[in-house]
Amino acid sequence: MNFRQLLLHLPRYLGASGSPRRLWWSPSLDTISSVGSWRGRSSKSPAHWNQVVSEAEKIVGYPTSFMSLRCLLSDELSNIAMQVRKLVGTQHPLLTTARGLVHDSWNSLQLRGLVVLLISKAAGPSSVNTSCQNYDMVSGIYSCQRSLAEITELIHIALLVHRGIVNLNELQSSDGPLKDMQFGNKIAILSGDFLLANACNGLALLQNTKVVELLASALMDLVQGVYHENSTSKESYITDDIGISTWKEQTFLSHGALLAKSCQAAMELAKHDAEVQNMAFQYGKHMAMSHKINSDVQPFIKEKTSDSMTFNLNSAPVVLHQEFLGRDLWIKQIGEAQEKGRLDYAKLRERIKAGKGVTSAIDLCRYHGNKALEALESFPPSEARSALENIVFAVTRFS
């Protein structure tokens, strides 16, 4: 059974998706000025999101869900997949990550590669530099740009796999045997490293030192961002004094840098000038920020939310809530939500919803959405540009 086949069979085996107590990563956010008017117009539902992605995939030529398939079907990763099967029945998060590679609609693990392809097509060939005219072009996209999209996905998936490494010091008896978690961690490290190695090999084959530099710096940003997210101890992480400006800086590193620099690299491969490269970078940056904030807001706006559902205490709505409330009152609210050493997320969620944090996070999401749309105005009207706009509309509408 190869890796792709294993992924397709995993949902059959996995009932509950319970994950261990705490992973070795988690995020954080500072104040918003005026947000400005919003230009979005589409409904943000899973069905609509899937439609937006499906239409975009038709524009770029093939489903992005198969972009990294060449790597995932390699003999080396097939051997790893056989080891992953041994984790079925455990609660190691690597299984959840693997399942998400096939069945992930809203987060769309292939979103980054899709955006790289769309912005490549939206920009088209350089009108000034004709040195790329001998490159293969399919559906308005150079072959090297398609390779870049695959590389972007490989890096993203590798980091997701590595983020699934469990902090063994924080395991509880309900998380299952220690040996299962140790084995799962070894497989997560091995498979993540393998994907990163393939991405590095693909970058070398592009034979463009600036693109290599951009993607290498994006990888450095990712690692630095995750380090900041995980820089506090278990005892103090729920009371971190993080402002929204700091949160935005850290979130760009961990969630926006890869897409922003990949979009810029796609323009470099087509020999576009610095201005076009910067606009592509700005779109990738602000779209990624909108997508992240939207995900942060979901636990607070879903109509049906389980009382046991947790949320990230360093997410955008929570950090903004703390800013508006003040440090002392925030710590008091956390203390009041503690019951027998456990945090009552349902009670804390209601306190946060009663404040300004959620609405301010929605405003911040739309602010970044507007910035992404402004960047697209530098590109000529086209189907690809419309698809990029629709992606922004989909991640910035909350009705």
Curated annotation (Swiss-Prot):
Coiled coil spans: none
Enzyme class per UniProt: transferase
EC number assigned by the record: 2.5.1.91
Pfam families for this protein: polyprenyl_synt (PF00348)
Pathway(s) of this molecule: Cofactor biosynthesis; ubiquinone biosynthesis
One term under GO cellular component: mitochondrial matrix
SUPFAM superfamilies: Terpenoid synthases
GO biological process, one term: cerebellum development
Subcellular location: Mitochondrion
One function term, GO molecular function aspect: all-trans-decaprenyl-diphosphate synthase activity
Quaternary organization: Heterotetramer composed of 2 PDSS1/DPS1 and 2 PDSS2/DLP1 subunits.
Disease: Coenzyme Q10 deficiency, primary, 3: A fatal encephalomyopathic form of coenzyme Q10 deficiency with nephrotic syndrome. Coenzyme Q10 deficiency is an autosomal recessive disorder with variable manifestations consistent with 5 major phenotypes. The phenotypes include an encephalomyopathic form with seizures and ataxia; a multisystem infantile form with encephalopathy, cardiomyopathy and renal failure; a predominantly cerebellar form with ataxia and cerebellar atrophy; Leigh syndrome with growth retardation; and an isolated myopathic form.
PANTHER family hit by this protein: ALL TRANS-POLYPRENYL-DIPHOSPHATE SYNTHASE PDSS2, GERANYLGERANYL PYROPHOSPHATE SYNTHASE
Family: Belongs to the FPP/GGPP synthase family.
Record's protein name: All trans-polyprenyl-diphosphate synthase PDSS2
